[in-house]
Amino acid sequence: MPEASSPFPDGIVLGFDVGTRRIGVAVGSALGAGARAVAVIDVHGVAVDWNALDRVKRNWLPVGLVVGDPLTLEGHDQPIRKQAHAFACQLRERYRLPVVLVDERSSSVEAASRFAGARAAGYKRRRDADTLDAIAAAVILERWLADPMQATSLP
């Protein structure tokens, strides 16, 4: 749960998992510990579908934004990291909300495990696999909710 020194006031927070073709979006409350997948936004080349993202923002009215910081498992830089940081800066400029970066190592593995569990229980089908990006965003957001002080602020 966010502490007094968190960059966000209490309220709704959106989390993002940035990929080369899609951006997963999740929602959570700064007062709680859970998050849920809500959307997958298409990326065309390097252009984000901002109209779709604007609708998500209008629907949820977040007080802050959490973007996954895609380091390698060893903690090194990788090409997608530059895109994720650029997206985080674009979010801050466009929405004038606080944005933080959260280490997303292994979030895709955890998301795949959650999806497999939901599929085995009959809640998801193979065609729902594109929701994996949104599930990964929920994992990232839950990490921030559990420990907001581990986040990195944008420069």
Swiss-Prot record:
Instruction: Give the record's keywords alphabetically.
Output: Cytoplasm, Hydrolase, Nuclease, Ribosome biogenesis
**Is DNA damage a UniProt keyword of this protein?**
no
GO BP annotations listed? rRNA 5'-end processing
GO molecular function per UniProt:
nuclease activity
Specify where it is mainly localized: cytoplasm
Q: Which GO terms describe its cellular component?
A: cytosol
Q: Which CDD domains match?
A: YqgF
Q: Which InterPro entries match?
A: RNaseH-like_sf, YqgF, YqgF/RNaseH-like_dom, YqgF/RNaseH-like_dom_sf
Q: What is its EC number?
A: 3.1.-.-
Give the enzyme class: hydrolase
List the subcellular locations: Cytoplasm
What family does the database annotate?
Belongs to the YqgF nuclease family.
> What task does this protein carry out?
Could be a nuclease involved in processing of the 5'-end of pre-16S rRNA.
Q: Matching PANTHER family, A to Z?
A: POLYNUCLEOTIDYL TRANSFERASE, RIBONUCLEASE H-LIKE SUPERFAMILY PROTEIN
* The name this protein goes by in its record: Putative pre-16S rRNA nuclease
Q: What is the source species?
A: Xylella fastidiosa (strain Temecula1 / ATCC 700964)
The beginning of the lineage is: Bacteria, Pseudomonadati, Pseudomonadota, Gammaproteobacteria, Lysobacterales
